[in-house]
């Protein structure tokens, strides 16, 4: 049986610079204090679960 040749893939971006693809948008994080305050008005238990889920 012949040995299978392994193809090597380039690890990093190519020699062309790699700046052709779309970048991630620059988006500010939401103010979590304001979000929690609004959630407390709607459903206090939901605000508590959200704090537990996000670690705040």
UniProtKB/Swiss-Prot annotation:
Pfam families: UBact. The keyword Calcium does not apply. Signal peptide: none annotated. Residues 1-56 are annotated as: Disordered. There is a cross-link at residue 56 (Isoglutamyl lysine isopeptide (Gln-Lys) (interchain with K-? in acceptor proteins)). One of its GO terms (molecular function) is protein tag activity. May function as a protein modifier covalently attached to lysine residues of substrate proteins. This may serve to target the modified proteins for degradation by proteasomes. This is Prokaryotic ubiquitin-like protein UBact.
């Amino acid at each position: 049986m012949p040995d299978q040749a392994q193809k090597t893939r380039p690890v990093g971006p190519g020699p062309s610079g790699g700046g052709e693809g779309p970048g991630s948008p620059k988006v500010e994080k939401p103010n979590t204090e304001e979000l929690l305050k609004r959630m407390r008005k709607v459903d206090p238990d939901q605000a508590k679960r959200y704090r537990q889920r996000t670690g705040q």
